[in-house]
UniProtKB/Swiss-Prot annotation:
The gene is acpB. Coiled coil: none annotated. Residues 165-270, 283-395 form the PRD domain. It holds the Pfam family HTH_Mga. Belongs to the AtxA/AcpA family. The keyword Acyltransferase does not apply. Keywords: Activator, Capsule biogenesis/degradation, Plasmid, Repeat, Transcription, Transcription regulation, Virulence. GO terms for biological process: regulation of DNA-templated transcription. This is Capsule synthesis positive regulator AcpB. It comes from Bacillus anthracis.
Amino acid sequence: MEKDIKRQIQILEIITSEEKWFTTIEISKILRCCNKTIMKDISFIKDFLPEDWHIKIKKGKGVRIYLPYNKHRNEITFLLFRESLTFRILQHLFERETKTIATLAERLYIQVPSILPALKRVENYLKKFGLKLRKKPLRLEGDEVRIMIMYLDLYLKSYNDTEWPFEKLKKEVIFQYLGTLEESLGISLHVVSKRHLSFFIAILLKRKQQGYKVQLNRKFLYFNTETPDYVKIGRIFEKLEREFGVSLTVQDKILLTISIKSSKYVYKDINKEKEESVQYFKEGNLSIYELVKDFINSLEEKLKVDLISDEEFIFALVDYFKRTIYHLQYLCMFERPQKQTIQYMQTEHSETFSAVKEVYTEFVKKNEIADYVSVEEIAKVTMYIEASRLRYTSNYKKVLLVTGESESWAEYLAATLAKRFGDKIQISTVFFAKKSDHDVNADFIISTIPLDLGSTPIICINSIPTERDYTNIQYYLDLQDG
């Protein structure tokens, strides 16, 4: 990204951070540039704003931005990012074939000497995805799946929730197919996952129309073809092939199956899903379930603990691998801030964490799944194991637990609360698509996120509960007992 656009985005982040006046000198000190440059950038941003956004500049006070309450600053940062040559070059290469730098410069209305530094920035952007930019002829080079993931990342940070960057591919049609998929698989996709999936499907279809082919070299990926989900998804995408005039290969269908499985969703009938998953696991007829069994056996041997008898743990691991295992090799492309819950597991359950790290790393290498496993994934498996251990020493009553963290942390937190309060509570976890208007069948709710449910008492706690949180829960339980 060009320095001026990057700086303009930073200015926007500063002036939208608080409802107050910011002096240009104050901003220039933060960004370490001259006052004149800041004034020029603010003038550019002012002309760039939508009609219902306003920037006021007052002598002696500075600059202040007024934006509608239902709008987010990202709407402008998206627009600014799309002005960058990095985006425009990659967008052009996505839309049409351009074989020479001279032709690219001409089509973008830029002089050749001016486009060369931008191409260098594009090369640096591509590096984190393991991709290269070839000059003769001009093209992206690398694994086709990585190219699609790169474009997914690019478009997600360039367009807001209501925008659709694929002119010749109808958004309504793709969303209609996603709705059919939800019905067939018995799931409800998170609204963010629907957007991600719709973009990914559009990118895959566009690349297919241009003649690009997906190659999947890891043997275990083909285990997907044995699963019921693959069969259901395949039937639905036969209609998609006719709609968009493409022919999907086995590799394409596997990739689409993986992208759907690894999305964020909840089961419409969790008990039915749990029963079927445990049954498939015990029958041992599907290769992917045999992989999970091998992993659990290795964990048992290393930790000297019985896990195979815990059906809750079996389902948790099967569901975890269903969502995660297929894209482990691509997770390294995305840097994620380390969550507080991960650090907690590393310190509070260091022995289990170390054992899981050793077993998991050996497992992915032996089965040629990935080269390494991130601490986040190690922590998730650690949470499931510790939740299983806690279940064996806890009795339950009933409470609804709502968290904004991962499913694995919800499992661990539920078991921790059950352990803490003995037979006074039974914990059930739930997924909220919204933060209000949800049918709740519980005496009270324990939540780590704000909720608006007037009919049911709510106790808000921290992601990692404090003694004060435990005291509040105990106080409420005592009130109920009284």
